[in-house]
Amino acid sequence: MTRISPKNSQYFPSPESKGGWQFLDKKIDKKVVSKINFEHLNKVIEEYKLFFDNVASGIVIVKDGFLVKEHYSFMTLPGSRFDVWSCTKSFTGIAWGLLLEESNNGTLPDNIKVDLDSFAYSFFPDSFKMTDKRKEKITIGHLLSMTSGIPGENELVFGIPPLDNFGPFEHALGYQENRYGYKTDQLISEPGTIWDYSDPAMAHLSILFKLIMRREMHEYMQEKVFDKIGIENASWDVHGGGQFIGPHTSAHVGLHISARELARVGYLLMQNGKWADDEVVPSSWIEKATKPSQTLNPEYGFTFWVNTHGTRWPGLPVDMFSLEGYNTNRCYVIPSKELVVVRVGSGPNQWNEQLFIKQVLKAIN
């Protein structure tokens, strides 16, 4: 098979079942090889192994479209899937970017019109009661940028864990406290005036997606994104159902995916949403989502973490952005370096990821 350099033409990896990523061949891909200090890169991975090989994890490094390095700890394989926790939020953001584009194109069911300034609660049926009058001012943009005023981590509201006799979406909508006694019925501020990392706010986006698109978000993403870029083995949790609201796609956590397949998403974003001849995700949405979405926390775009002002990762490129989840599940994208770095795992909660990326960049010019 003829090897294709992504620097000279548009290269996109086939699905894993059909060969997957092209590995860097030191004898053939001399142009790319000349840019990489393999001795230093190997040292970076060895140091990582020394500290973190006691937990299940995987690392994939893609440069110029080639898989230049990967590492898996004990009992972990290239196909091993991990719950990437809040990286899921960025997938929700991608889904909403597609929904907004469909609105622009007039292809939503019943030609519904939606934009970032649309009031979220205007799409809920009357049966969804509003627990705080101020919620009528919450926009789609507020939900995607964590500025809705719906209680989140600042108020010790983590996830959407329900009581035994209520569902998770009942808690997210403010109808019932969670199993730890925390409530979301009242906003902590007027929408757009405070930044708070809120899982209940993200849960709103799942219900709204179904109401507007008439499809569950995970089903839509499978067709519109996953199938097109060769993601074959990812799965997405759903919440609720039975006598409770739902079941609906989990918007804040619950995507299970391998390091290699998560790297496909990073590569898609690095290519401004293009995959081969198909614009899978609108480039205009990627541009908007990977820049600060508001001034309250300029390190947060629309569901992506960003470095536009050089404050999130000082000393690293300002075009760098990431998908981030608990247990340091990460997908870093640096378009100016044509670099994607993925780390998936079951821990630790924190590590010096900034130093790790700096050392990877030192090895890859």
What are these regions (language model features)?
Residues 1-77, 101-113, 215, 361-365:
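N-terminal leader/targeting segments and the immediately adjacent pre-domain N-terminus
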Residues 65, 83-116, 143, 205-209, ...:
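Active-site SXXK
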Residues 72, 78-79, 154-242, 248-253:
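Catalytic-site signature segments of enzymes, centered on catalytic residues
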Residues 83, 102-151, 211-252:
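Active-site helix/loop module of the DD-peptidase/beta-lactamase fold
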Residues 201-208, 253-275, 329-345:
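Active-site-proximal alpha-helical segments within enzyme catalytic domains
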Residues 221-222, 226-291:
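Active-site-proximal binding-pocket segments
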Residues 232-233, 238, 291-340:
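Active-site Gly/Thr loop motif
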Residues 323-365:
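Structured C-terminal helix/loop/strand segments within mature extracytoplasmic catalytic/sensor domains
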